[in-house]
C-alpha cells in the first residue's frame, strides 16, 4: 500500500527513558523512510513479529539481496519496539495501527540494534569488531539499568542475562547486515569463527531463552552452515528461496508497483518487462531500488550497477564446474535450469558444484528461483544486461562463438531465409542433445530459446505460451522500444508431424 504523508513527523523521546547509539535508539532512520517521496507501507510485518514474540519462533533470519528493503525493515522494527522513543504518531495511519495488539507492544521493549557493516568500518578491522560492539552496548546497558550491578559483566549476553535475572526484563536484538564477515572476510576463518561464537553466545542456550523476546537478523546470505546444519539452528530462515509468511514484505509486490505506476503515470507493461521476475510463492516481487529510481529518473534502464556491479559475478560464473557456462548461456537465452539449492553452505567459498554457484547467485539477486519447479532463471531485462556485461567483459570464447551462430540464425529469420534457419537450428539442436531430450516439444522450445540468444540485444526475453485469442503462441519476441521501428516482432509456432501451412493457419485464426 502506498502511504502518503500528510505532515512532517518528529521524533519524541519517551519520558524517563535513555536513548543510546545501540541500546534503545531513536526512530530517526525510519522517520526518513516514512517521509520519503516513495514509501510503501510494510508495517504489516510487525503483526507477524508481534505474534512470534516470546515463542519458539522468535528467532528470525530474513535474508534478501542488496537494496531490497533490509535496512528500512530493521529501522521500522526498532522504531516500533524501542523504549527510546514515542512513535505512536509515526505509526498512526499505517497498517500495523489497525491491528488489535498495536499498543500492547508499541515502544515497550529494550532494543539492541546495530549494523555490522557500519561497525566493521568503525572498528577498523574484523578482529576488533566484537570488542567494538561490546564496548558500546555494555556501557549503555549499565547506564540504562544503574540499579543492576553490571561491573563484572564484560559481555553483551552476560549483561542481558544479569538484567533479566535481576528485573525480569527481556530484550529485542536486531542486527542489520549480519553476514558482512561471511561475505567480505570469506577466507578469514578465524574471524568468522569468532563472530559465529559471538552470535551463538548471544542467541543460544538456556539463558538466551530467558532474556530474548525477539531476535531479527537480516543480510544477503542465510545463516552459515557448519557441515550440514545451520550454525544457529534455532533461527527460522526466510530467504529468496522461500520467504514463507514474510513474502509480502520483501521488495515491492505487483499491486504496489501498479499503484506506483498509476501515481507517476508510468507504463506498467514496460515496468514488468524491465524489472519483474522474482517469484516468491504467489507473489511477483520487484527490486525497490529500481522502481524508486525509475520514478525519479523516468528512464527504463538498469539501476543494478548502483547496487552491485557485474564485476561481483565474474569470479562466480567463471568457476570451472561442469555445466556452469552452459547453464548461464541457457538462462541468458530466456530458459530456466534445474538447480539443487539444498547443499549450499551459505558462504562465499564452499562451492562443490555448479548448483552451489547458482544458489549463491539466487541469494545475491542475480537469479530468481521457482520453488515449485526447482529451477533458476535470469529475472528480467535489468539483470540480463548485467550478465551480458559480465560475459562481454570476460570475453567468453564459448559465448562469442555461440553468439556468432545465433546472429546468423537471427539475420536469416529477418530475411525469411527458411533453408538457413533450418540449418542453424538443426546445428544448435545437435549440440544440445547431450543435455536435453531430442524429440519432444519442450526440448525444441529450449533449443529455440538458446538458438535465438543473440536476439536479447534487440528483443525482450521471449514470452512463452502467450494467449492469442484461439490458443497460445509458443514463442513471441517483442522488440525493445529502441528497435521497434527497425525490427519486427517474431512469432514462433511449434508443430510436430505437421507442415508450416498448419502453423500459419493457426496463427491467422
PLM features: residue spans?
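Phosphate-binding site recognition
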Residues: 2-440, 455-459, 463
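Structural signature of nuclease core domains in nucleic-acid processing machines
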Residues: 418-509
Amino acid at each position: 500500500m502506498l502511504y502518503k504523508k500528510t505532515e512532517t513527523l518528529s521524533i519524541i523521546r519517551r519520558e524517563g527513558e535513555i536513548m543510546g547509539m545501540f541500546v534503545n535508539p531513536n526512530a530517526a532512520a525510519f522517520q526518513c523512510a516514512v517521509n520519503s517521496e516513495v514509501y510503501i507501507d510494510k508495517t504489516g510485518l510487525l503483526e507477524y513479529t508481534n505474534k512470534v514474540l516470546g515463542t519458539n519462533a522468535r528467532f528470525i533470519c530474513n535474508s534478501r539481496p542488496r537494496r531490497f528493503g533490509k535496512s528500512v525493515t530493521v529501522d521500522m522494527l526498532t522504531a516500533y519496539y524501542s523504549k527510546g522513543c514515542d512513535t505512536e504518531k509515526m505509526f498512526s495511519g499505517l497498517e500495523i495501527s489497525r491491528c488489535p495488539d498495536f499498543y500492547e507492544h508499541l515502544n515497550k521493549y529494550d532494543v539492541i540494534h546495530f549494523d555490522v557493516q557500519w561497525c566493521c568500518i568503525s572498528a577498523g578491522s574484523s578482529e576488533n569488531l566484537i570488542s567494538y560492539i561490546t564496548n558500546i552496548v555494555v556501557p549503555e546497558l549499565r547506564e540504562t539499568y544503574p540499579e543492576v550491578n553490571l561491573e563484572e559483566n564484560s559481555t553483551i549476553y552476560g549483561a542481558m542475562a544479569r538484567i533479566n535475572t535481576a528485573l525480569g526484563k527481556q530484550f529485542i536484538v536486531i542486527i542489520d547486515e549480519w553476514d558482512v564477515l561471511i561475505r567480505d572476510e570469506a577466507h578469514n576463518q578465524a574471524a568468522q569463527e569468532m563472530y559465529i561464537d559471538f552470535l551463538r553466545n548471544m542467541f543460544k542456550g538456556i539463558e538466551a531463552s530467558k532474556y530474548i523476546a525477539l531476535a531479527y537478523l537480516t543480510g544477503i546470505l542465510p545463516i552459515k552452515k557448519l557441515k550440514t546444519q545451520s550454525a544457529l539452528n534455532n533461527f527460522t530462515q526466510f530467504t529468496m528461496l522461500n520467504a514463507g509468511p514474510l513474502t509480502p514484505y520483501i521488495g515491492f509486490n505487483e499491486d504496489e508497483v501498479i499503484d506506483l505506476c498509476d501515481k507517476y503515470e508510468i507504463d506498467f507493461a514496460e515496468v514488468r518487462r524491465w524489472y519483474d521476475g522474482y517469484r516468491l510463492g504467489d507473489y511477483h516481487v520487484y527490486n525497490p531500488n529500481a522502481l524508486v529510481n525509475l520514478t525519479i529518473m523516468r528512464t527504463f534502464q538498469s539501476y543494478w550497477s548502483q547496487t552491485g556491479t557485474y564485476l561481483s559475478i565474474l569470479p562466480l560464473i567463471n568457476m570451472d564446474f561442469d555445466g556452469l557456462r552452459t547453464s548461464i548461456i541457457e538462462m541468458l537465452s530466456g530458459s530456466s535450469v534445474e538447480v539443487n539449492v539444498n547443499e549450499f553452505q551459505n558462504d562465499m567459498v564452499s562451492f562443490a558444484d555448479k548448483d552451489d554457484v547458482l544458489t549463491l547467485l539466487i541469494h545475491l539477486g542475480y537469479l530468481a528461483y521457482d520453488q515449485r519447479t526447482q529451477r533458476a532463471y535470469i529475472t528480467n531485462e535489468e539483470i540480463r544486461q548485467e550478465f551480458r556485461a559480465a560475459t562481454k567483459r570476460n570475453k567468453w570464447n564459448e559465448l562469442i562463438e555461440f553468439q556468432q551462430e545465433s546472429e546468423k540464425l537471427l539475420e536469416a529469420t529477418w530475411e525469411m531465409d527458411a533453408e538457413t534457419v533450418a540449418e542453424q537450428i538443426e546445428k544448435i539442436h545437435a549440440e544440445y542433445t547431450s543435455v536435453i531430450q531430442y524429440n519432444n516439444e519442450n526440448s525444441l522450445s529450449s533449443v529455440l530459446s538458446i538458438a535465438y540468444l543473440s536476439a536479447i540485444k534487440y528483443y525482450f526475453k521471449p514470452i512463452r505460451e502467450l494467449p492469442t485469442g484461439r490458443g497460445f503462441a509458443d514463442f513471441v519476441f517483442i522488440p525493445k522500444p529502441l528497435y521497434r521501428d527497425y525490427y519486427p516482432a517474431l512469432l514462433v509456432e511449434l508443430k510436430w508431424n505437421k507442415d508450416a501451412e498448419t502453423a500459419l493457419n493457426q496463427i491467422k485464426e
